[in-house]
């Protein structure tokens, strides 16, 4: 007896085939009768328009790469190819949340070209903003002889962030660690920082060189939380180039809280600077408290 023709078999009786080639034929009914189409043509028609829709997510530029959170380990060093991609502004195979583990610290990508075209001297260098997952150490905004909290005059925001001991000396350890981890690639750029305070509000500032600095509320939360605002008569000097939330914290808010309390640079009162709480809360703290140093910096 001859074999049963495929035309007389039920679909469930056919041999399974999982590796079709472009020349394979697929039966298809167009409403007038049964026709055939090659697998290559079927596939092309099925994805028609899809590539155009997803292309913006795959473009090699800062805008596209700022829009994708991946969170991949990139190893223990930035490769020559990765630095080349950063320099070119293509950021090939680098995405928000990706990180390098160097010296036991996860240095995580927080933004691409965040400072591009900003500053009194325009930043024209393509770059990646990096934020460590953990605090590098604890330090005070205003130093005391005891090295810890002291009441009274020890808690002052006079001189703003630029006038603080954090800015003047307590960030040096972080700068040394970071410059060792990313030797020759830490970008110096210009940002506007508070250097005067009146009645517990920022009253003056200046353009400053920045390599490694504390973040501000806008970078972490996307807006000011406790930073003083205009009361209709008095306008605090809250000038800054960091006007938007870092994509890292926008895409993955859990990265804000690392279960430690750490400093931000905003002046909140005559005695308090902003901070992120260990429970994930926004807050502020006396300047003499010794809490976490979790700075941001750029590599290029």
For the regions a protein language model found, what residue spans apply to each?
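Collagenous Gly-X-Y triple-helix signature in extracellular proteins
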Residues: 52-300
């Amino acid at each position: 007896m001859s074999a049963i023709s495929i035309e007389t078999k039920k679909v469930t009786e056919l041999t399974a085939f999982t590796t079709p080639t472009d020349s394979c034929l697929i039966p298809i009914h167009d409403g007038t009768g049964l026709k055939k189409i090659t697998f290559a043509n079927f596939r092309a028609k099925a994805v028609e328009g899809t590539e155009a829709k997803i292309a913006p997510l795959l473009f090699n530029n800062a805008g596209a790469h700022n829009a994708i959170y991946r969170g991949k380990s990139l190893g223990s060093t930035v490769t020559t190819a990765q630095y080349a991609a950063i320099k070119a502004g293509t950021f090939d195979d680098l995405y928000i949340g990706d990180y390098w583990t160097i010296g036991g610290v996860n240095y995580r990508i927080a933004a691409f070209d965040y400072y591009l075209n900003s500053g009194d001297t325009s930043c024209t260098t393509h770059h990646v903003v990096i934020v460590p997952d953990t605090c590098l150490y604890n330090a005070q905004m205003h130093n005391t002889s005891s090295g810890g909290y002291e009441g009274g005059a020890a808690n002052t925001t006079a001189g703003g962030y630029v006038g603080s001991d954090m800015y003047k000396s307590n960030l040096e350890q972080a700068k040394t660690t970071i410059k060792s981890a990313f030797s020759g690639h830490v970008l110096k750029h210009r940002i506007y920082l508070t250097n005067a305070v009146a009645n517990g509000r920022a009253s003056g500032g200046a353009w400053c060189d920045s390599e490694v600095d504390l973040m501000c509320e806008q970078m972490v939360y996307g807006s000011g939380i406790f930073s003083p605002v205009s009361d209709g008569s008095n306008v605090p000097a809250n000038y800054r180039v960091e006007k938007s939330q870092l994509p890292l914290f926008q895409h993955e808010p859990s990265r804000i809280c690392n279960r430690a309390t750490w400093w931000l640079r905003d002046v909140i009162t005559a005695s308090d600077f902003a901070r992120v709480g260990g429970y994930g809360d926004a807050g502020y703290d006396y300047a003499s408290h010794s809490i976490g140093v979790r700075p941001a910096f750029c590599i290029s």
